[in-house]
Curated annotation (Swiss-Prot):
Pfam family, one: GTP_cyclohydroI
A cellular component annotation (GO) from this entry: cytoplasm
Stored NCBIfam families: folE (TIGR00063), PRK09347.1-2 (NF006825), PRK09347.1-3 (NF006826)
Protein's UniProt name: GTP cyclohydrolase 1
Residues that hold Zn(2+) according to the record: C76, H79, C148
Family: Belongs to the GTP cyclohydrolase I family.
Species of provenance: Streptococcus gordonii (strain Challis / ATCC 35105 / BCRC 15272 / CH1 / DL1 / V288)
Entry EC number(s): 3.5.4.16
Catalytic activity: GTP + H2O = 7,8-dihydroneopterin 3'-triphosphate + formate + H(+)
The entry's keywords: GTP-binding, Hydrolase, Metal-binding, Nucleotide-binding, One-carbon metabolism, Zinc
Subunit structure of this chain's protein: Homomer.
Group of enzyme by EC: hydrolase
Biological pathway: Cofactor biosynthesis; 7,8-dihydroneopterin triphosphate biosynthesis; 7,8-dihydroneopterin triphosphate from GTP: step 1/1
Length: 187
């Protein structure tokens, strides 16, 4: 039995265990749909976000590069419920070395497609960029709403969790960090 078939069977059993009839008309294809969905939302497993930085250019650019409001969704590893929001990814090039802007979004995508904690997600994005480019500094901010806080437990819809990771000059120099924060919050 393949992993995909095992996953379908597990979803079928889950439906039975919660008191549902997995053989009723509306649920007949649900195990297959859920198995496909999990393959998609966990497609970052076994992949390194650093590998997304395949295009590196010497452009002589010495100022901040920021891609903000990168949408993402991930799955909380504690409850397997979604969390979603935006990531802001900035770096200060070293020796003019830059990467394609889409590579920043791709790294966010790979890191988010796995059972995850927001704190770890933020760190994985920052570390991947730092290791791939060796820039003067990296700053990553992730803002997300967690369904585990909305649908269950404390039930606080609309609450946002914000996590940051600063490396290099953005960790060492408060003025540099303030510049990035003002750019992120500028519309």
């Amino acid at each position: 039995m393949s992993d995909f078939e095992k996953l379908q069977e597990t979803v079928y059993q889950l439906l039975e265990l919660v008191g549902e009839n997995p053989d009723r008309e509306g649920l007949l294809d649900t195990p297959k749909r859920v198995a496909k969905m999990y393959q998609e939302v966990f497609s970052g497993l076994g992949r390194d976000p650093k590998d997304e930085f395949t295009a590196v250019f010497s452009e002589g650019h010495e100022e901040v590069v920021l891609v903000k409001d990168i949408p993402f969704h991930s799955m909380c590893e504690h409850h397997l419920l979604p969390f979603y929001g935006v990531a802001h990814v900035a770096y200060l090039p070293s020796n003019g070395k830059v990467t394609g802007l889409s590579k920043l979004a791709r790294a966010v995508e790979v890191a988010s497609k796995r059972p995850q904690l927001q704190e770890r997600l933020t760190a994985q994005i920052a570390t991947a960029l730092d290791e791939a480019l060796s820039p003067e500094g990296v700053f990553v901010m992730v803002e997300a709403e967690h369904m585990c806080m909305t649908m269950r437990g404390i039930k606080k819809p609309g609450s946002k969790t914000i996590t940051t990771v600063a490396k290099g000059i953005y960790k060492e120099n408060v003025h540099q960090r303030q510049e990035i924060l003002s750019m992120i919050h500028h519309d």
